[in-house]
Amino acid sequence: MYAFPTTRIAPRRKQPKCIKPPKCTSKYDIKFKDIAIYILERKMGASRRYFLMELARKKGFRVEPDLSEYVTHVVSEKNSGAEVLEWLQAKKAGSIPNVAILDISWFTDCMGAGQPVEIERKHRLTLQKICVCKSPSPVVPSRVGVSQYACQRKTTLDNKNTLFTDAFEILAENYEFRENERSCLSFRQAASVLKSLTFTIAGMADVDGLPGFGDHIRAVIEDLIEDGESSKVSEVLNDEVYRSLKLFTTIFGVGLRTAEKWHRLGIRTLEEIKSNENLKFSKMQIAGLQHYEDILGGVRKAEADAVAMVVRDAVWTFLPDAVVTLTGGFRRGNKTGHDVDMLITSPIQGKEKELLHKVINLWKKQDLLLCHTIHESTMDEDNLPSKSVNLLDHFQKCFAILKSNQHRGEISSCDGPHDSRERGKRIWKAIRVDLVFCPFEQYAFALLGWTGSRQFERDLRRYASHEKKMMIDNHALYDKTKRVFVKCESEEEIFGHLGLEYIDPVERNA
């Protein structure tokens, strides 16, 4: 028998959640009144969701900004049926009757047809029934041995805690905009830890013992567990500064400083940017505005493979023995991405230095190049690896926008709202491409660095410095104790010299 205290302890009063997501004020004629679409932001991001909502509305579809009893179709991208169902239940919406839970492919087909299409089996997300029976021997998830370093954790794309990591990434981005580096890193590190877990956080006890989970982070988790949403995240999403900076930085060539300047000038929309005659744009920003819809729509794996072949063909025209590798998120197994990262080298020393300008000139002749900027190499082979975890490397690079010559009917019609006249003429899509040229002896380090993820590389550098008295960047590995550079011909060798278990690229999604 428990002895209850005579003094009554008042429960903690939760902050009322009076902040609601902004309602869309756009007005379009609704042609198809029998369906109401809700687009799930989870794993998609606010900017892309807004773009898709507006695209559907322009085509006469009814799109609900919030989940309600009116919704007939829930559309999701890169989520499993179980993940969507879990999210709906967290929103107390699991009992909405007759709602169709669909993959983005159904939405894509509708946009292409200009009308609702029949739901086929391929469109439906598979839902697993959740057993509510009590287990006599519940399995307690283990948090023992979760390293503070992402390079000691295996992190696949099977993120079981997206409710929390999505919230953390919004907060981290807001802190980045506010230049609060410490809080930004704290939330990104916490998100990275949760992505590596093999179980879903169900209670506060599940985060006990996890590295880097302070009071601020735990408070957000507690809100999400209890209510399925966070007042802090809602505040950020409704903050005018955040929304402006988020929108402006989605434009290719626009950094934080430019975004802040535009916001101070009272600019809030893309239309205001385009119509402001007093603004001066770089050539990259002009291209970013011209091809905004294509670039915001992202790149699919098939498109990345097609672009990679274009790059290989161009490089091999001048140097047949060159090594040309698709890196970045696609090497980590992602099906979509923001751009295409290509790493290029040659076993013949110095030959890679001659390639870039030849490739650029070839693409100009082929009318494939929409825009580009070149950063020449600033490399000094005698320099030690950088101590900074943020500093970019010194390789020769080209940041470009290429035409991907594929029929737009084969590309998701979600990639941009083009009118029928433009669709009739254009058979290409604008895709961002980053080319990086490195010496062959540095290829292993460059491959490791450009594969990512960003948090994985950050923690790899921290681990090398703090635990092994070594320094590593995209160029080299240096042993501070022996005062020597450590030669490595592969990623496996780099992991070995650092005393780390080798982690496959598809497990580096920290």
UniProtKB/Swiss-Prot annotation:
<dbReference type="InterPro" id="IPR010996">
    <property type="entry name" value="DNA_pol_b-like_N"/>
</dbReference>
<dbReference type="GO" id="GO:0046872">
    <property type="term" value="F:metal ion binding"/>
</dbReference>
<dbReference type="Pfam" id="PF00533">
    <property type="entry name" value="BRCT"/>
</dbReference>
<dbReference type="GO" id="GO:0005634">
    <property type="term" value="C:nucleus"/>
</dbReference>
<dbReference type="InterPro" id="IPR002054">
    <property type="entry name" value="DNA-dir_DNA_pol_X"/>
</dbReference>
<feature type="domain" description="BRCT">
    <location>
        <begin position="27"/>
        <end position="124"/>
    </location>
</feature>
<dbReference type="InterPro" id="IPR029398">
    <property type="entry name" value="PolB_thumb"/>
</dbReference>
<dbReference type="InterPro" id="IPR028207">
    <property type="entry name" value="DNA_pol_B_palm_palm"/>
</dbReference>
<dbReference type="GO" id="GO:0003912">
    <property type="term" value="F:DNA nucleotidylexotransferase activity"/>
</dbReference>
<keyword id="KW-0539">Nucleus</keyword>
<feature type="binding site">
    <location>
        <position position="434"/>
    </location>
    <ligand>
        <name>Mg(2+)</name>
    </ligand>
</feature>
<feature type="binding site">
    <location>
        <begin position="449"/>
        <end position="450"/>
    </location>
    <ligand>
        <name>a 2'-deoxyribonucleoside 5'-triphosphate</name>
    </ligand>
</feature>
<dbReference type="InterPro" id="IPR037160">
    <property type="entry name" value="DNA_Pol_thumb_sf"/>
</dbReference>
<dbReference type="InterPro" id="IPR001357">
    <property type="entry name" value="BRCT_dom"/>
</dbReference>
<feature type="region of interest" description="Involved in DNA binding">
    <location>
        <begin position="254"/>
        <end position="258"/>
    </location>
</feature>
<feature type="binding site">
    <location>
        <begin position="329"/>
        <end position="334"/>
    </location>
    <ligand>
        <name>a 2'-deoxyribonucleoside 5'-triphosphate</name>
    </ligand>
</feature>
<dbReference type="GO" id="GO:0006259">
    <property type="term" value="P:DNA metabolic process"/>
</dbReference>
<dbReference type="Pfam" id="PF10391">
    <property type="entry name" value="DNA_pol_lambd_f"/>
</dbReference>
<dbReference type="GO" id="GO:0003677">
    <property type="term" value="F:DNA binding"/>
</dbReference>
<dbReference type="InterPro" id="IPR022312">
    <property type="entry name" value="DNA_pol_X"/>
</dbReference>
<dbReference type="GO" id="GO:0006303">
    <property type="term" value="P:double-strand break repair via nonhomologous end joining"/>
</dbReference>
<dbReference type="InterPro" id="IPR043519">
    <property type="entry name" value="NT_sf"/>
</dbReference>
<keyword id="KW-0479">Metal-binding</keyword>
<dbReference type="InterPro" id="IPR036420">
    <property type="entry name" value="BRCT_dom_sf"/>
</dbReference>
<dbReference type="Pfam" id="PF14792">
    <property type="entry name" value="DNA_pol_B_palm"/>
</dbReference>
<feature type="short sequence motif" description="Nuclear localization signal">
    <location>
        <begin position="11"/>
        <end position="17"/>
    </location>
</feature>
<keyword id="KW-0780">Terminal addition</keyword>
<dbReference type="Pfam" id="PF14716">
    <property type="entry name" value="HHH_8"/>
</dbReference>
<dbReference type="GO" id="GO:0006304">
    <property type="term" value="P:DNA modification"/>
</dbReference>
<keyword id="KW-0548">Nucleotidyltransferase</keyword>
<dbReference type="InterPro" id="IPR027292">
    <property type="entry name" value="TdT"/>
</dbReference>
<dbReference type="Pfam" id="PF14791">
    <property type="entry name" value="DNA_pol_B_thumb"/>
</dbReference>
<dbReference type="InterPro" id="IPR027421">
    <property type="entry name" value="DNA_pol_lamdba_lyase_dom_sf"/>
</dbReference>
<feature type="binding site">
    <location>
        <begin position="338"/>
        <end position="341"/>
    </location>
    <ligand>
        <name>a 2'-deoxyribonucleoside 5'-triphosphate</name>
    </ligand>
</feature>
<dbReference type="InterPro" id="IPR018944">
    <property type="entry name" value="DNA_pol_lambd_fingers_domain"/>
</dbReference>
<dbReference type="InterPro" id="IPR019843">
    <property type="entry name" value="DNA_pol-X_BS"/>
</dbReference>
<dbReference type="InterPro" id="IPR001726">
    <property type="entry name" value="TdT/Mu"/>
</dbReference>
<dbReference type="GO" id="GO:0003887">
    <property type="term" value="F:DNA-directed DNA polymerase activity"/>
</dbReference>
<comment type="similarity">
    <text>Belongs to the DNA polymerase type-X family.</text>
</comment>
<feature type="binding site">
    <location>
        <position position="339"/>
    </location>
    <ligand>
        <name>Mg(2+)</name>
    </ligand>
</feature>
<comment type="function">
    <text>Template-independent DNA polymerase which catalyzes the random addition of deoxynucleoside 5'-triphosphate to the 3'-end of a DNA initiator. One of the in vivo functions of this enzyme is the addition of nucleotides at the junction (N region) of rearranged Ig heavy chain and T-cell receptor gene segments during the maturation of B- and T-cells.</text>
</comment>
<feature type="binding site">
    <location>
        <position position="341"/>
    </location>
    <ligand>
        <name>Mg(2+)</name>
    </ligand>
</feature>
